[in-house]
Amino acid sequence: MSAVKTLEAVARDRVGKGAARAVRRQGQIPAVIYGGGQPPQSIAVDLIRTRTLIYAGGFKTTLFEINAGGKKVRAIPRDFQLDPVTGVPLHVDFLRVVSGQTVTVEVPVHFVNEDAAPGIKKLGGTLNIVAHTLSLEVAPDQIPDAIEVDLTGRAIGDVIHVSDIKIPAGTYTGEATDPVANIVPPTVLGAEVEAEEAAIAEAQSAEAAEEKAEESAEDEKKDGEEA
């Protein structure tokens, strides 16, 4: 399970675009804590610390203890905004966590023991991943870091469903029959790549022929005008 992480914050009295810009100029990020049957609380968190947490991965599945003005609040990130050009965080939304509450989160899927899968190791098959994350409804303090899928003994043609996986905590929000991955023969993906490359080459050839035809028509037009 993910450990609870601490995050220092300061309370914000002013809100709005102007106030948010002022916060960012001070090296902080405007944020809000909402939910739990309480009014939203506007805060500011350190830019460098928050950016590091976001880009380290697993940010939205981490439970935080936020210390704002001496008052500690447990919350989980629900959303964040990044500058489309620089990638710098612009705003973070935190959901306040209360006793007995569950949240829905996307937990990453990690595949292990690929070398112990005969279909991959011996026969050259390829692991085709269908779901990189699984949606779980789980208590905030029980969110797993990842869901492991053991590939030991897997052969070509095997399909791994959610029902084949041990969910460490919480409940999967989809169907037990949902596929997570399958092992395909080496020729399958190769054929798909070849078909895609052939389609691209055909499209490029057609485009080149069209451009050449347009150039020829333009040359004929010029010759006619000169005559």
UniProtKB/Swiss-Prot annotation:
GO terms for cellular component: cytosolic large ribosomal subunit. GO terms for biological process: translation. Residues 199-227 are annotated as: Disordered. It comes from the Bacteria. The keyword Cell wall biogenesis/degradation does not apply. Keywords: Ribonucleoprotein, Ribosomal protein, RNA-binding, rRNA-binding. GO terms for molecular function: 5S rRNA binding; structural constituent of ribosome. The keyword Oxidoreductase does not apply. Residues 209-227 have a biased composition (Basic and acidic residues). InterPro entries: Rbsml_bL25/Gln-tRNA_synth_N, Ribosomal_bL25/Gln-tRNA_synth, Ribosomal_bL25_b-dom, Ribosomal_bL25_C, Ribosomal_bL25_long, Ribosomal_L25_dom, Ribosomal_uL5_bac-type. This is one of the proteins that binds to the 5S RNA in the ribosome where it forms part of the central protuberance. Belongs to the bacterial ribosomal protein bL25 family. CTC subfamily. Part of the 50S ribosomal subunit; part of the 5S rRNA/L5/L18/L25 subcomplex. Contacts the 5S rRNA. Binds to the 5S rRNA independently of L5 and L18. This is Large ribosomal subunit protein bL25.
